[in-house]
């Protein structure tokens, strides 16, 4: 997550010798890369379309609509649209922005004479993001993205000097590895189910299960918990989230510890890292600033949709045909990473064309404000949703059907689009961006915009 990557860093006392005074100045409005802000804003709001499912329904329903939330009529249609157009695509755009932010932060610092001293600022920023992510995951919502982004950020810094070609090739190799892992996982699931069924037959025959049989049975049960959990497990999850803050905290802690473990984390980390590398390459080639030609963006959009949408639609149709059977899904979803990257890049191209054309200015200005406050808005999603769905709030967990959750999304979008530009009329940063920056430099940063700057800001927003 890189919500303030479009602004120059400000110097901490301990880094003053390495970072010259100009870096202390906030980046003037004229220097903002608004296209990147708009892209980040679109990605952030789009991510909520997916995250709302994990906020409002049992976690297995995110992938498998037969678990909860309805799997027919408008609910199945909602799942279908979600999978084909959105699932993983919005996160991909957000990861692109994070990678671009690495290039922005480091290149601006180095151009202003910071040299390798920018590494000090970069790693302090990243470590604070890591801490924010841990707190967010355990205290508010297990589906946190800050922690894995920070982990990726720790190893992104050395890649900043590499050529766009090398970055893109590395990203393509990671996507290929992830595709191979999905196929391998399918064979693993098939073998695990076979061994679990054998253990079940042994138990029914009254024979004592071996250690291998016990392990096979448990491994398969763990797989089903994530894709097709038994009704009693679903009910327990619902009860936990509708209960007290403590019961929800215990459930969150269990999920977070599982998701932070190696088996769950490597595919997700590689997925994010690949897109961050693409973002770094695209930033170097001016793709994310709407500076490439119309032909370039049109070709990217056309090719991305032509390649990605049919692949995604076929996988969705096959999933429905097998009724989301766990053993079949890894084979069906083998094309997931290819399809999501293709469609995400097409979405990117469309957004860049809108910005380039100067169309929908009333909306893009608000999206840019949402993007500039991405950290604050991201956490606002978690706070609002936890109060709507969990027992220490309204307790609406698992009470909405899948399609109905999107009405909640619309209200949160409205809040972000209204609140963000109003806040930025008066302050340089969002509240959490300011906190993050102050912690990074271990010095309270200027927050309020001076009156003359505020007037310029307002005039700029109201001008055509």
Question: Model-flagged regions — what are they?
Answer:
Residues 2-464:
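Alpha-helical transmembrane segments and their immediate juxtamembrane cytosolic regions
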């Amino acid at each position: 997550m890189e919500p303030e990557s479009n602004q120059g860093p400000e110097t901490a006392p301990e880094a003053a010798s390495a970072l010259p005074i100009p870096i202390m100045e906030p980046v003037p409005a004229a220097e903002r890369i608004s296209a990147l802000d708009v892209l980040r804003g679109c990605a952030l709001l789009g991510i909520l379309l997916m995250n709302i499912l994990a906020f409002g329904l049992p976690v297995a329903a995110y992938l498998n609509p037969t678990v909860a939330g309805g799997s027919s009529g408008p609910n199945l249609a909602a799942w279908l649209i979600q999978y084909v157009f959105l699932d993983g695509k919005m996160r991909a755009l957000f990861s692109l922005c994070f990678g671009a932010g690495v290039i922005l932060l480091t290149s601006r610092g180095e151009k202003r004479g910071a040299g390798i001293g920018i590494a000090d600022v970069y790693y302090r920023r990243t470590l604070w993001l890591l801490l924010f992510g841990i707190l967010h995951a355990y205290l508010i919502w297990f589906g946190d993205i800050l922690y894995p982004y920070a982990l990726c950020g720790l190893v992104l810094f050395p890649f900043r000097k590499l050529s766009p070609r090398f970055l893109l090739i590395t990203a393509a190799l990671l996507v290929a590895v992830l595709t191979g892992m999905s196929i391998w996982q399918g064979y693993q699931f098939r073998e695990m189910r076979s061994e679990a069924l054998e253990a079940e037959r042994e138990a029914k025959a009254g024979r004592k299960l071996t250690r291998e049989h016990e392990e096979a049975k448990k491994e398969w049960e763990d797989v089903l918990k994530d894709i097709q959990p038994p009704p009693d497990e679903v009910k327990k999850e619902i009860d936990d989230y509708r209960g007290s803050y403590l019961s929800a905290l215990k459930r969150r802690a269990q999920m977070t510890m599982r998701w932070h473990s190696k088996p769950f984390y490597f595919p997700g980390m590689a997925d994010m890292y690949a897109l961050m590398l693409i973002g770094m390459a695209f930033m170097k080639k001016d793709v994310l600033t709407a500076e490439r030609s119309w032909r370039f963006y049109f070709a990217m959009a056309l090719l991305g949709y032509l390649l990605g949408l049919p692949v995604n639609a076929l996988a969705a149709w096959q999933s429905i045909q097998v009724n989301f059977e766990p053993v079949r899904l890894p084979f069906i979803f083998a094309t997931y990473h290819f399809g999501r990257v293709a469609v995400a890049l097409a979405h990117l191209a469309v957004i860049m064309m809108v910005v380039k054309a100067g169309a929908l200015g009333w909306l893009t200005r608000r999206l840019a404000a949402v993007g500039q406050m991405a950290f604050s808005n991201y956490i606002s999603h978690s706070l609002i949703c936890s109060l709507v769905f969990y027992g220490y709030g309204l307790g609406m967990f698992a009470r909405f059907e899948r399609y109905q959750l999107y009405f909640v999304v619309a209200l949160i979008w409205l809040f972000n689009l209204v609140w963000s530009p109003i806040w930025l009329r008066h302050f340089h940063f969002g509240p959490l961006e300011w906190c993050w920056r102050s912690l990074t430099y271990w010095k309270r940063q200027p927050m309020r915009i001076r009156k003359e700057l505020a007037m310029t800001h307002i005039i700029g927003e109201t001008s055509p």
